[in-house]
């Protein structure tokens, strides 16, 4: 918060925001501002994220929606007194919000204490159900695929997705002893191989029903043979993965997926590829943390930190939208915030006042390389989508 005091004394920073120094907020003003949110819960912020999600759907018009659900640990281990900073599974004290992504966009989040595990209560089912209902009521009835890791493997979740929501899912499975024993008894001839660029897997698929389940589900066992750089892995360090999915099992949902142009998702190889893309999806966590600059939240009160976290998430969604709507010809869509700042924010400029106007002056090289005129034009005319309220 002290950085606000430094910026308040920076006339150039104030001018860049089209403010005068006396209009800039101090650290005490920001603390008073966030204190207003102590009694404000998650719901109002989640409503804003949902509206932005619907806006992006109408802008990008996807025929198939792939959601990714996971928790993100915010390491606040240095905090001496901070509400809801509790031990996490990463053996660090902090917060552990539940997050749902569509591509790079954070479309829903539930701010939670650090000790609250992935599949706590019915949080995940309610969050997914809320998004699915919004998609169907305010966008269109398109196939939805949900990607999760083994922390969300639960028969209750699966039945909710299959029977209530009517969506497809790909979920990492837990490595139970009887399952591993079954796989070890299989012959090499029963395995098939799949490679994606330099990465290679051996896999086998079968129907599996755990003791507490009342139905069989499609299960795929894969073992990673080579790393992304093509390096072969020794037998004792190979990564084994179980995957559960209803793609190809639920005939009605699979047919809708094929009609929407997703016939390739029915293949075992594509399911393995999607499941292992969860690791890439987790790079969204890195992007959010890098966007913020650090993982520590600044306040002692949970309500103030909650508001701070949601403002960060909303800003990150708008940042991702800006890269695609305004800066797509200038900077890669998948660049991290540090690269974005270095190329599109941290460049030399001069602010001069002439008459009653402030003028931002840059060199000719920056003007042409960053296409300042085009950025200015697109920033002033953002894409508009007709959204049903």
Name each model-derived stretch.
Residues 1-48, 102-106, 136, 144-146, ...:
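Short, positively charged, Gly/Tyr-enriched micro-motifs
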Residues 21-23, 27-99:
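Active-site-proximal, Lys/Arg-enriched surface segment
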Residues 168-283, 287-290, 381-389:
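An anionic, glycine-rich sequence signature occurring as long contiguous blocks
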Residues 318-389:
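A short, flexible helix-boundary coil/loop motif
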Residues 1-4, 21-22, 26, 30, ...:
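Short, conserved catalytic/metal-binding motifs centered on acidic residues
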Residues 87-139:
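Electropositive, glycine- and tryptophan-enriched low-complexity nucleic-acid-binding patches
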Residues 255-260, 264-275, 290-307, 323-335, ...:
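Short, solvent-exposed helix-loop connector elements
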Residues 119-178:
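Domain-level cores of phosphate- or acyl-group-handling catalytic modules
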């Amino acid at each position: 918060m002290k950085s606000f005091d430094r910026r308040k004394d920076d006339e150039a920073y104030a001018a860049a925001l089209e403010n005068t120094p006396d209009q800039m907020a101090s650290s005490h003003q920001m603390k008073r501002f966030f204190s207003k949110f102590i009694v404000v819960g998650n719901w109002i912020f989640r409503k804003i994220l949902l509206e932005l999600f619907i806006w992006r759907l109408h802008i990008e018009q996807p025929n198939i929606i792939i959601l990714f659900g996971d928790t993100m640990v915010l390491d606040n281990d240095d905090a001496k007194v901070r509400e809801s900073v509790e031990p996490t599974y990463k053996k660090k004290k902090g917060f552990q919000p539940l997050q749902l992504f569509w591509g790079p966009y954070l479309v829903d989040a539930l701010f939670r204490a650090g000790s609250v595990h992935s599949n706590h209560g019915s949080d995940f089912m309610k969050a997914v159900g809320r998004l699915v209902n919004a998609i169907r009521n305010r966008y269109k009835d398109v196939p939805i695929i949900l990607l999760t890791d083994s922390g969300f493997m639960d028969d209750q979740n699966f039945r909710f997705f299959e029977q209530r929501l009517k969506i497809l899912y790909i979920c990492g499975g837990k490595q139970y002893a009887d399952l591993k024993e079954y796989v070890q008894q299989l012959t090499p001839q029963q395995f098939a191989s799949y490679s994606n660029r330099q990465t290679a897997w051996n896999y086998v698929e079968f129907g599996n029903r755990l003791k507490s389940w009342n139905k069989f589900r499609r299960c795929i066992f894969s073992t990673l043979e080579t790393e992304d750089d093509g390096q072969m892995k020794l037998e004792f360090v190979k990564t084994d993965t179980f995957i559960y999915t209803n793609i190809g099992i639920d005939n009605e949902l699979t047919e809708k997926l094929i009609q929407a142009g997703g016939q390739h998702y029915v293949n075992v190889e594509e399911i393995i590829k999607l499941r292992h893309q969860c690791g890439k999806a987790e790079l969204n966590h890195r992007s959010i943390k890098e966007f913020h600059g650090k993982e520590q939240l600044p306040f002692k009160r949970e309500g103030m930190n909650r508001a701070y976290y949601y403002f960060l998430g909303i800003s990150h969604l708008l940042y991702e939208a800006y890269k695609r709507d305004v800066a797509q010809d200038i900077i890669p869509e998948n660049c991290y915030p540090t690269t974005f700042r270095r190329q599109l924010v941290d460049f030399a400029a001069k602010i001069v006042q002439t008459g009653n106007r402030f003028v931002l002056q840059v060199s000719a090289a920056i003007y042409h390389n960053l296409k300042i005129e085009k950025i200015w034009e697109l920033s002033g005319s953002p894409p508009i989508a007709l959204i049903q309220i």
